[in-house]
């Protein structure tokens, strides 16, 4: 039942929010739409990518963020192998393998190279700053 909900944002905590926002800008064509130098003790930037807002903020006083485990390729699937958010994903309309090659030329590390998850569905995982994993799915 629709209660008037709509997806709003993903919120990331970053060691270097400015550099992380610029990474999303450079690698995925994101647009920095808001910059706050000190929001409750930390800088925060909003980046619009693929119709979605990614909120990126720094460490606040008293916080001690821990890193997530890197994504791991198991037999037939990939996972961080821990509770909570595993990754977020974008659909890519085009040749995903060629797009990944372009990202690699820009210095992006592929956590999982493009592969056929099931017939007709190619996907991969990008290693983004701060241990974040981004799934890219070839639209088909």
Which sequence ranges carry the predicted segments?
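Short acidic/glycine-enriched loop/turn segments that link adjacent beta-strands
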Residues: 39-43, 117-122
């Amino acid at each position: 039942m629709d209660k008037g909900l709509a997806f709003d944002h993903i919120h990331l905590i970053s060691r270097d929010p400015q550099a992380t926002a610029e990474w999303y800008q450079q690698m995925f064509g994101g647009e920095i739409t808001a910059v706050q130098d000190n929001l409750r003790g930390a800088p925060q930037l909003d980046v619009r990518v693929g119709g979605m807002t990614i909120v990126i903020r720094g460490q606040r006083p008293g916080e001690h963020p821990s890193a997530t485990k890197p994504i791991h390729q198991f037999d037939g699937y990939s996972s961080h192998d821990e509770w909570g958010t595993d990754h977020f994903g974008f659909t890519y309309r085009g040749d995903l393998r060629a797009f990944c090659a372009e990202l690699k030329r820009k210095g992006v590390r592929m956590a999982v190279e493009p592969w056929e998850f099931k017939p007709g569905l190619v996907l991969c995982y990008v290693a983004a700053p701060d241990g974040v994993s981004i799934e890219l799915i070839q639209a088909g």
